[in-house]
């Protein structure tokens, strides 16, 4: 009986530790701020591949967005 209670307590403790680690990991990810850089689009048209390749030349892009007229917005994490 005592062994079963100890095992149950250990399982519950492990569960809460893992839950806390997951929550703390999510909080740290949320704290990372996103920045964006606006760069001119060479062709003057919204071509997704052109924006994507222009944004990839910047530091660690997360996403790229083509905005009319003639601009690309590159999203990345602030350093």
From Swiss-Prot:
InterPro entries xref list: DEFL
GO cellular component terms given for this protein: extracellular region
Signal peptide positions (record): 1-25
Main location: secreted
GO biological process: defense response to fungus; killing of cells of another organism
UniProt keyword Heme present: no
Keywords: Antimicrobial, Disulfide bond, Fungicide, Plant defense, Secreted, Signal
Pfam name, any one: SLR1-BP
Disulfide bonds: 35-78, 46-66, 51-72, 55-74
Localization, UniProt: Secreted
Family: Belongs to the DEFL family.
Designated name of the protein: Putative defensin-like protein 146
Organism: Arabidopsis thaliana (Mouse-ear cress)
């Amino acid at each position: 009986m005592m062994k079963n209670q100890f095992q149950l307590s250990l399982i519950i403790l492990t569960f809460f530790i893992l839950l806390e680690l997951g929550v703390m990991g999510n909080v740290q990810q949320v704290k990372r701020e996103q920045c964006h850089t606006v760069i001119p689009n060479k062709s003057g048209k919204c071509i997704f591949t052109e924006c994507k390749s222009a944004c990839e030349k910047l530091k660690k892009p997360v996403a790229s967005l083509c905005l009319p007229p003639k601009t690309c917005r590159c999203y990345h994490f602030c350093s």
